[in-house]
Amino acid sequence: MGGFEMPEIGPPYFLGIVVGTQGLQSGIFDLRGNVIAMSFYSYPEYHPRPGWAEQDPLDWWKAAQDTVRRCIFEGEVRPEDIAAISVSAVSCTVLPVDRFGNPKYRAIMWMDVRAFEQAERINATQNPILRYAGGHESPEWMIPKALWIKENLPEVFANADLIVECQNWMVFKLTNRWVTSLNNAICKWNYCPTEGGWPVSLLRELRFEEILDKWPRELLAVGQPVGELTKHAAYDLGLIPGIPVIQGGIDAYAAMVGLDVVHPQRLALVIGPSTCHMAVSEHPIFSSGIWGPYYEAVIPGLWILEGGQSSTGSIIKWFGENFASEECREACEVGEDLFVALDRIAAQVSPGADGLIVIDYFQGNRSPYQDPLARGAIWGLSLSHTKAHVLRAIYEGAAFGTYHILQTLAKDGFEVQEVYASGSGARSKLWLQIHADIANIPIYLTTVEETSVLGTAIFAAYGSGFFDSIADATLKMVKVSGQIYPNQSHHEIYRFYYDKYVRSYFALRDLMHEVSSKEGGRQISL
């Protein structure tokens, strides 16, 4: 750090802004990772058709204005003490814009799967670049969505100077510069540093090379300086112009950094409405159904593997709304965390849920089957089962899904040695214990729950010269607060039920596909 003496607490401060699915969160941190202030602002989603999901980009900027100003006020922070800013965002949320950033259409959210047919055409090419996407292009990603815009909204496509992601757009709003995060490009745009960079051969096969002229071609890795905060942006946010703006990336990958998962054999378990699994490897691991391997997507010289479950916390929310609304209402009235109330219900039932099995494919399966037509299932019901059994089985089914991903990685040569957990789902101590018991691996917790915001602030601190590397920054700014150890006797019980969980998909797959196809299953998210 060039002889810089780190204060115990206080400035310099670093502002992390994260555009999420349900809202935007801003946070201010010091060099030791202490939270100075945190603020959240929600915004709506629009669902004009089944399987479609859109947002108004102007809502993101309004949310940024509100949360940054609130952080400055509530944290009693002087704007001149903000040393650097970075922004991360959900991915892949795509929008067509003119060169001034004016949207030509609502943003097509990451969960939107209208580009299913375009993704299938991409997969049919069997282009070698797909090897770095788990062998299968997702309709969530940039190329399928951009191709959908061209084919279904030709005037919008023709009039758009750029087709960008939410993260590009937010950085432009801060700096008036169009750049692309290398993190996003590698993970969602089929950019491959070890295979020549931009996916020209794939685009040529699709006769879609023109999209290259609509992408910001300057690539910056996370932690690299983009520019300075403009006068206009500073006015909107209640800051001062000239603050360095540092490149961020995908929110889940920022969360990985905020968990200190920047070393080989570690895995970040980010549990929200869905669950993301990011693992760090010294070597490329090609695993069917696992996205990647992504070279230098975050950490120089290292590869990242990404697994995912499309619906985990969202299933628990579904259960709470439909079967435990009274308990949830009572918890809200007394200011109790909903997971505390739900844990009390699920804890009434022993491991294995008395033979009840939940298949967590309510929104399809992302890893390892990459099957958008898969459906959720609850089987093994008897008249002795209660709603507590169903909730316990949901907890276990989601944890079985994570274990399935870990087992898939292990089969292909990658052994996870340490798991670090965050996200709203990490507030459930019972659920984390079930994850640890099923996987038979310790789970580490950190002091800051909002790890994507912390990780984004770490990008800012590193990129503005206060640390020599991202790993050096995480060493100082991320603190382990606890560890959950597996219960070996519970693990032995779960081994029996995990086998039934895995076999259930193959027993039900044809039925799932028949029903999904009849009911418009292509709306289901990957």
Where are these regions (language model features)?
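N-terminal phosphate-binding loop and adjacent alpha-helix
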Residues: 39-78
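Conserved phosphate-binding catalytic cores of ATP/NTP-utilizing and phosphoryl-transfer enzymes
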Residues: 4-10, 151, 230-239, 249-266
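Short glycine-aspartate micro-motif
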Residues: 12-18, 26, 81-87, 163, ...
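Glycine/Thr-rich phosphate-binding loops that ligate phosphate moieties of nucleotide
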Residues: 2-40, 46-47, 58, 83-124, ...
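Gly/Ser/Thr-rich active-site cleft segment
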Residues: 19-21, 32, 129-250, 316, ...
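Stable alpha-helical structural segments in soluble proteins, enriched in small hydrophobic residues
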Residues: 63, 67-75, 170, 259, ...
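Phosphate/pyrophosphate-binding loops at sites that engage ATP/ADP/AMP, CoA/4′-phosphopantetheine
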Residues: 64-83, 153-157, 202-212, 235-237, ...
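Short, hydrophobic/amphipathic alpha-helical packing segments
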Residues: 61-69, 143-146, 250-254, 312, ...
